[in-house]
């Protein structure tokens, strides 16, 4: 069986996702699709618009065969750890032949070339990177500058203004990290990319003439009404959203504020909250009236909006250093969120070919620390979204789509 893996958030599932899924099937000529999807918290460091089971239903309606959960620890981390968690999970299933992801550039050879340099870390590249970090540049920017300088030094024939754009575009960054993880794992999975069409990943405005970003759809749902987003998502996705509730970002801010005020030392447990940003957050927590306001008061050249969002999310989820250290390792279980008949066949192949622990229903006995963290994340999410109850992870079985 020729199986393709895709890495998604579906927050929410829209027309761009539908196109990516269709094209992924075509370009890889696959027999089935496994989707690794973020759970109730996503890579921007925010609660998902709607819960992971509703989004699983969207994926299955769209034609995904098997949906598995990306553990929350990876799902709420930077591109490097997000990609490693997802790719290593797909790799450990021992049934995935291809991985297909979107990118702004659509050039798999360039993406592979850049990821190879990063993995091999030639000495000159490392020196350039060290120099840019000393200048105070945030790591992603320092790395992109070091890559360009290294390629220039090696007389690599390219348009460097184009290359700069490639290295600083959200989906390209993730694409490079996916390939980097494949190299590190010495995986036999073959990477494919599809050029992203329509609005920019970070574009927050809906436009009738193009495929909208998930950011724009979420903003529309939060600020006006769901009807405005109908033209930008499949009908099945819209119908599922129409009949569910959404996470409340104001409640998230209240919980983050409570966590910081009641225990200011919580920031010392998060390695990302260093270089004085911990003090800046504590100083501004009383001045801000919303999550957005707090982040804007604290952000700087080194600490971007999204990076701060992830720090605040880790405060909310009470992440500690011991837990964060687990991001270096591949998950040793796979949590099944849903499947169709073909997905059931793929599960049989996984059982036959892989030693990974397959989790269908949760037991209240002691489990893997990553899985325990997922359960805690869902319980915290239940304070933000009324459609989810405490202990939903124990109560809700994988969705079977017929």
Curated annotation (Swiss-Prot):
A biological process term (GO) from this entry: tRNA modification
Gene Ontology MF terms: ATP binding; ligase activity, forming carbon-nitrogen bonds; tRNA binding
Residues annotated as binding ATP: 7-20, 102, 171, 196
RNA-binding among keywords: yes
Primary subcellular site in the record, as a coarse category: cytoplasm
InterPro entries with a match to the protein in the record: Rossmann-like_a/b/a_fold, tRNA(Met)_cyd_acetate_ligase
A GO cellular component entry from the record: cytoplasm
Enzyme Commission number, as recorded: 6.3.4.-
Superkingdom of this protein's organism: Bacteria
Keyword set, alphabetical order: ATP-binding, Cytoplasm, Ligase, Nucleotide-binding, RNA-binding, tRNA processing, tRNA-binding
The reaction(s) this protein catalyses: cytidine(34) in elongator tRNA(Met) + acetate + ATP = N(4)-acetylcytidine(34) in elongator tRNA(Met) + AMP + diphosphate
Subcellular location: Cytoplasm
Ribonucleoprotein keyword on record: no
Family the entry assigns: Belongs to the TmcAL family.
PANTHER family: TRNA(MET) CYTIDINE ACETATE LIGASE
UniProt function note: Catalyzes the formation of N(4)-acetylcytidine (ac(4)C) at the wobble position of elongator tRNA(Met), using acetate and ATP as substrates. First activates an acetate ion to form acetyladenylate (Ac-AMP) and then transfers the acetyl group to tRNA to form ac(4)C34.
Protein name: tRNA(Met) cytidine acetate ligase
Organism: Clostridium perfringens (strain SM101 / Type A)
Lineage: Bacteria, Bacillati, Bacillota, Clostridia, Eubacteriales
